[in-house]
């Protein structure tokens, strides 16, 4: 909201992730443990970013964070296709979360 008031436009997904990345960079080395996914839709289309406690910022199509992420990646890697329907994508996401929480 503050960005909109200052700039007269909505913040892009890329700019929002850069803002979080810059904030986290200031706290690097302080023992924080954080991994965050920032996603949204702007003028450029859909955007997905991963930001961690060191301010590392990655753009990608698929991310998993947290202690069970290796289990989730196993499910996602085996079932991911670029032509997934919305229903198939939701099902894949649900299965990845179930496996990650069950195994973790």
Swiss-Prot record:
GO biological-process terms attached to the record: fat cell differentiation; immune system process; proteolysis involved in protein catabolic process
Gene Ontology MF term list: threonine-type endopeptidase activity
EC top class named in words: hydrolase
Cell compartment(s), UniProt: Cytoplasm; Nucleus
Induction: Up-regulated by interferon gamma (at protein level).
Main localization of the protein described in the UniProt heading: cytoplasm
Domain of life of the native organism: Eukaryota
Catalytic reaction equation(s): Cleavage of peptide bonds with very broad specificity
InterPro entries to which the protein is assigned, alphabetical: Ntn_hydrolases_N, Pept_T1A_subB, Proteasome_sua/b, Proteasome_suB-type
GO cellular-component term (any): cytoplasm
Keywords linked to the UniProt accession: Cytoplasm, Differentiation, Hydrolase, Immunity, Nucleus, Protease, Proteasome, Threonine protease, Zymogen
EC number: 3.4.25.1
Function (record text): The proteasome is a multicatalytic proteinase complex which is characterized by its ability to cleave peptides with Arg, Phe, Tyr, Leu, and Glu adjacent to the leaving group at neutral or slightly basic pH. The proteasome has an ATP-dependent proteolytic activity. This subunit is involved in antigen processing to generate class I binding peptides. May participate in the generation of spliced peptides resulting from the ligation of two separate proteasomal cleavage products that are not contiguous in the parental protein. Required for adipocyte differentiation.
Subunit and partners: The 26S proteasome consists of a 20S proteasome core and two 19S regulatory subunits. The 20S proteasome core is composed of 28 subunits that are arranged in four stacked rings, resulting in a barrel-shaped structure. The two end rings are each formed by seven alpha subunits, and the two central rings are each formed by seven beta subunits. The catalytic chamber with the active sites is on the inside of the barrel. Component of the immunoproteasome, where it displaces the equivalent housekeeping subunit PSMB5.
Family note: Belongs to the peptidase T1B family.
Protein name: Proteasome subunit beta type-8
Source organism (scientific name): Sus scrofa (Pig)
Gene behind this protein: PSMB8
